[in-house]
């Protein structure tokens, strides 16, 4: 008789019971409460970013599989898993579109607030992986000039560089990229190696930043030297990722035009994609046929939207983006005069983050504006 398997799953994984229950008994726990005792007799562990998966957690456990439904890897001791032959899967790319849409929304908000035309600015994208390439794709659709910096990709894809150069899409040095009007970072956090990204935007490099420039970090805390960043005069900072979360830096917090609690990749679609990717891989490891009955539990699609045209195309798009996800609400949700209160709000908002859907889930009614129709279609909206 086959024993029923036990799966310990972070309770922030959406639809955990609906997706995973046919594989065994599902036990959900807050990520920070998953400890050695809770996984001791479990067969699978599925986490987000709040659980440190290492020897102290797993050494006396029966865990046969570890899955992470988020893209970051700094909470996973992959060396330990490999040494003990524990299969591991991370949902790389699951939230890339969500983060890219957050960046584009922030760009349009900044442009309207500071009264500049995005088509007259240059966007420097540092890190052109799953997220960065989508940011570039969407930005170029919207007529924004981009500079791309990604040394690991540049080295790994030398044959592609000739074709990319012909399209005007070749990589540039970090020094050149940092001359862009707006800088957005999309690298992993790596602390060693030839291309380490810890303090990639170092105190020395921050001295080169000019007061008209904008810095966005929706990648990882630690990529930008936070102490030096506080002393750097910029037009604006948009910060979604911080060192030592949720105990974010009070001085840096005060500099942010938009301060959000690491939620750029938190669309419902991104979370479901992460769960699904891990689920399908676990089914493969356990030789089980995947099921899709969980889909009937999803919320209905958003109500169709009518576009209210503004005086400019940029203003029209900004208003539409705010209809789909108003990032100012994310900022206001953690704002407080007392930094200790900010820290409390930070964690609470992440755990109780409101549901929002990505652009491809939204139906938009556009009349008598072929250019707007084409642009929205290229961005993934459903046109009616």
Label each residue range with its predicted role:
Residues 10-11, 92, 100, 119-140:
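Glycine-rich adenosine-cofactor-binding loop
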Residues 14, 141-162:
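NAD(P)-binding Rossmann-fold cofactor-contacting core
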Residues 1-42:
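N-terminal glycine-/charge-rich "phosphate-binding" loop or analogous flexible N-terminal tail
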Residues 53-54, 155-250, 379:
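Rossmann-like adenosine-cofactor binding region
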């Amino acid at each position: 008789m086959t024993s029923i398997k036990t799966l310990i799953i972070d309770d922030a994984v959406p639809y955990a019971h609906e997706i995973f229950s046919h594989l065994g008994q599902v036990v959900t726990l807050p990520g920070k409460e998953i400890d050695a005792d809770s996984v001791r007799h479990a067969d699978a562990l599925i986490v987000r970013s709040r659980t440190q998966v290492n020897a102290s957690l797993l050494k006396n456990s029966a865990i046969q599989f570890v899955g992470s439904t988020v893209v970051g890897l700094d909470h996973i001791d992959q060396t330990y898993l490999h040494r003990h032959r524990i299969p591991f899967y991370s949902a790389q790319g699951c939230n890339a579109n969500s983060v890219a849409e957050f960046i584009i929304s922030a760009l349009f908000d900044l442009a309207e607030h500071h009264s500049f035309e995005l088509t007259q600015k240059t966007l420097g994208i540092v890190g052109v992986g799953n997220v960065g390439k989508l940011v570039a794709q969407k930005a170029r659709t919207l007529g924004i000039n981009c500079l791309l910096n990604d040394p690991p990709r540049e080295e790994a894809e030398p044959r592609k560089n000739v074709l990319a150069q012909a399209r005007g899409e070749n990589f540039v040095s970090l020094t050149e990229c940092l001359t862009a009007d707006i800088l957005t970072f999309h690298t992993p956090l790596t602390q060693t190696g030839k291309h380490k990204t810890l303090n990639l935007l170092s105190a020395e490099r921050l001295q080169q930043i000019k007061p008209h420039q904008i810095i966005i970090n929706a990648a990882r805390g630690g990529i930008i030297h936070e102490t030096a960043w506080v002393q750097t005069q910029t037009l604006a900072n948009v910060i979604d990722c911080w060192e030592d979360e949720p105990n974010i830096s009070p001085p840096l917090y005060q500099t942010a035009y938009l301060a959000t609690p690491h939620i750029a990749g938190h669309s419902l679609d991104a979370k479901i994609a992460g769960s699904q990717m891990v689920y399908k891989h676990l089914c493969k490891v356990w030789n089980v046929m995947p099921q899709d009955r969980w889909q009937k539990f999803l919320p209905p699609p958003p109500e169709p939207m009518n576009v209210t045209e503004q005086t400019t195309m940029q203003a029209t798009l900004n208003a539409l983006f705010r209809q789909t996800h108003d990032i100012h609400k994310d900022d206001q949700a953690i704002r407080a005069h007392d930094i200790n209160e900010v820290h409390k709000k930070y964690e609470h908002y992440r755990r109780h983050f409101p549901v929002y859907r990505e652009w491809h889930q939204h139906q938009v009614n556009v009349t008598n504006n072929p250019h707007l129709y084409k642009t929205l279609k290229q961005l993934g909206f459903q046109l009616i």
